[in-house]
Amino acid sequence: MPVSFENNWKNILDKLRNLFRTEFAGTLPVYIGTAPDAGTQYVQLTPTGSELLEYNVTSESREFTINVVYYFAEHNVKKTGLDHVLRYVSRIEALIHDNMAVTLTDSSNLYNCRMETMELLPDDEAGVYVVQWEYKCQHTGNIS
């Protein structure tokens, strides 16, 4: 007999992408997986793993981890370019903070959603800034 399941990864990634698209209203492309050569700025979401937190007969709780990358390229990056990057960093972090709990398309909930670490990787010669976050969220699924 086949198992019934929800594609939690797809639901979580779609919700996260929709949060970004709603907030930035088309000004910041968002890609899941490999980002094509997408221009001067974009966000890339890459699933990296999950950890089982609680397992019992009626459900399981997992913590999902997603690598979030903000890419910004500007030739001859000056102070204004860095200001732009830091404004986006702060706005993205505020967006995630304001959505610590969200409902997925299957009506299940994500909770304890947060950005745990952030790393700013400037490449002054290439005029590129890459900002990486480790996004984590918890989900209870396989409820019977």
Go through the PLM ranges and name each one.
Residues 37:
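Short, charge-patterned binding micro-sites
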Residues 40-48:
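A short, hydrophobic beta-strand-centered structural micro-motif
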Residues 1-34, 49-144:
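Charged, amphipathic alpha-helical segments and their flanking helix caps
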